[in-house]
Amino acid sequence: MLHIPILRKGNPYKSIDVARVPHFKTRETFVEISQANAGLIRRDLLDQESSRELLAAFTTEQLIAMLKRAADYFMTDTLPVGDEMQTAEDYVRQLSATTGMPHALVRKNMSKISGVMAEMGSVLAGLTRGLDLKILDAGFGSHEGHAVSFFPRTQSLGVILPSNSPGVHSLWVPAIAMKIPLVLKPGASEPWSPYRIAQAMIKAGVPKEAFSYYPTDHGGSGAILQNCGRGMFFGDSSTVGKYANDSRLELHGTGYSKVVIGDDLADDWEKYLDVMVASITENGGRSCINASGVWVTRHGREIAAALAERLAQIVPRDSEDPQALLAPFANADVAKRISAIVDSGLRESGATDLSEKHRGARLVEWEGATYLLPTIVHVESHDHPLANREFLFPFASVVEVAPEELPEALGPSLVVTAITNDQKLINKLVTSPHVDRLNIGPIPTMKIAWDQPHEGNLFEHLYARRAFQRAA
């Protein structure tokens, strides 16, 4: 039986307490994972300075070069996983086995993670706004003719990770280039990615002490967030909400991302159907940057009908099928609860499931696995309960609003793709505090430039600027 250990400052540690993670289809145990209790985590985190000192001994440019090598190791090399060795193909197969994600989608996410490591110089240039990276090495210097000084806010970054999509791991990778050690809590059914990323970086020369890896329970997660000076927390609105006022944490919750078609281009909606489809369906519809809403001023029902017809082509396929676009649910009860929530919303007047006539039932069993088939709902008002919802499958509400209600009616949105030439609407979106990432023009919500901030700027999360003067 494959066993994944805890990593205590890079050193493998097997615990008596283990979690047994099943294969998504057979439900037989696929991997055992050592579990760290809160006491062990708190004890280990009493000394964070030594790991930080080891990273700080390298220049930023040296760490960027290491990450470039690690990108290749992550994609192609055979790396340790517990007492065994894992090829890149093993990683794809194992991740798919515990999460249900099709192999093709795992490989796309692999490329995303590798790409961020390989292009770390560009990523840091974007996050630091072109800061001379030697300033991070010295702690001070001159930027655009002004004296500047930056200091780390923390000795480590604690990260509570999800299981829904491996691509999220690209968000914490830059911490190593910024000389901040990582304390990682993997998702319950996706322990593979953070472990493999760490091993790739260690092989590339990053000190192993920069990586602590603690599979743990709710109490252990709390110990990580409480004892690391800075944190990153992935979860839905209900789990991240209680930390909303904790400035030490960068929260990654429900996205409520949207495609908005301005009134000026509403009659041309068919030109943008591909953008809407890609925004809703890529990565199995499981990302916070997937569009969960299409907001229009006219032609709402026509747009919803066209989307429903296109998405009906997405059906369950074998996980090794290169055309597989839909991920099953590792836990069938989760799929049942989600489908029940959608049905409850549909019982309220003003919403219609336009996918039903194409696909039949939403909740289906196929070859021993449970799926939710793509669902497009036409909603007559932005006040309807389904107007602003997000679920872990390709789901979107097509919402009709009056032109004057945009963008105020949108509510908080991680990504907004605004298809419009209306400068007044563009200006409102640009100045809106509720839009985190803004695309002007027909850009899928899933298309991300990783040198741009994502739900906060990681450099500003990990470093602060101080006033600085030095005598001549």
Language model features with spans:
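Glycine- and acidic
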Residues: 51, 178-186, 290-292, 410-414
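Short, aromatic/basic amphipathic alpha-helical patches
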Residues: 197-199, 243-245, 306-307, 428-433
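Rossmann-like NAD(P) dinucleotide-binding subdomain of oxidoreductase/dehydrogenase enzymes
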Residues: 129-277, 453, 459
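Short, flexible loop/turn motifs enriched in small residues
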Residues: 11-16, 152-153, 165-168, 369-372
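ALDH superfamily catalytic-core signature
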Residues: 76, 203, 228-230, 236-381
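Short, well-ordered alpha-helix to beta-strand connector turns
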Residues: 154, 228, 246-247, 291, ...
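Conserved C-terminal structural/oligomerization subdomain of aldehyde/semialdehyde dehydrogenase
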Residues: 23-36, 60-75, 186, 203-208, ...
